Structure formats: structure tokens, C-alpha cells
Amino acid sequence: YPRILKDHFAIDFICDTLRMMTMNLEDPHQVEDAMEKQLEKHHHEAADPAHAMQTMADGLPALGIVAAVLGVIKTMGAIESPPSVLGGYIGGALVGTFLGVFIAYGFVGPFAAYMQAVYDEEHSFYKIIQDVLVAHLHGNAAQISVEIGRGGVPTKMQPSFTELETALDSIPAEVG
């Protein structure tokens, strides 16, 4: 399972949970609570860069307004200049406003939203791991536990029951 092997948090998450299970902490609710706390902490920490980008996106229009105000001040300082000079100052003020709004809503905001979507998708992946392990702790058979995990897969990626069954049947007996 290459995705799990490349994901250090997923490996630690699975190993820590299995370690708790081997230490006779077999109450599924306690294990689920511990896993939930670990997932919340990880999700909160992983989302910090997206929150920082969104904060920057929220502030950029204000910088555009500051540029507009400075442009107006500069224009007022040269009020006796010919219209062509005043037009340049006013144009500069408008460009500053436009850039602040354009960069915020055209680049930084969408990038922050994309980052958050990636973190949310990762969180779904970890949540599926949690669902499968907790279902197993409740005494369900492996196929039932995996089916419970399948229910948490986002719809656009969720395999059908038949696809999952085919994948499970393809696992060699010595592994399963």
C-alpha cells in the first residue's frame, strides 16, 4: 500500500493504535477518543499554512485601499498640475486598488482554499483508517470493518461494494 508507506503520520497513527490495542486497551470508545484527539491535533496543525494564506488574502484588499488613499493624497499634493499628470496619479491609485483585490481574490484566496481542500482530503484518509480500526475493535470481521471504512470514502473516490470485494479477493491468503 504505497500511499500508506509514504505517509509517516498514517504509519505512526496505525502503529500507535495497534500498540494501544496490544496493551489491553480494548474499549473501542477509549481507543476511538484517543484517535479522534490525535486526528484533531494533526488536522489543526496541518491546516496552519492554509489559514495563514487565507489571512494574507483577507488583508490584501486593505493594502489596495491604502494604495488608493496614498494615490489620492499624492494627487491632492499636485492638484495644480496639468490633467495628464493628475491622471497618472489617479491611475496609480486605481492600479493599487485593483492589484490588492485581484491578487487577493484571484490568486492567494483560491490557493488557500486549495490548500485547505488538500488537508481536508488527507483528514478523510486518516478518518477512514480510524473507522476501520475502531470497527475491528468492535469485533467485526475484516471485510465488515473495511466496508465500514468504505462508507467514509468521499463519493468521488468511493469504490462500489463490488469493486471493494474484488480488491479484497485479490489479496493473497497469507497476507489477509
Model-inferred region functions:
Residues 1-49, 121-176:
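Large intracellular
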Residues 38-118:
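Helix-termination/interfacial motifs at the ends of transmembrane alpha-helices
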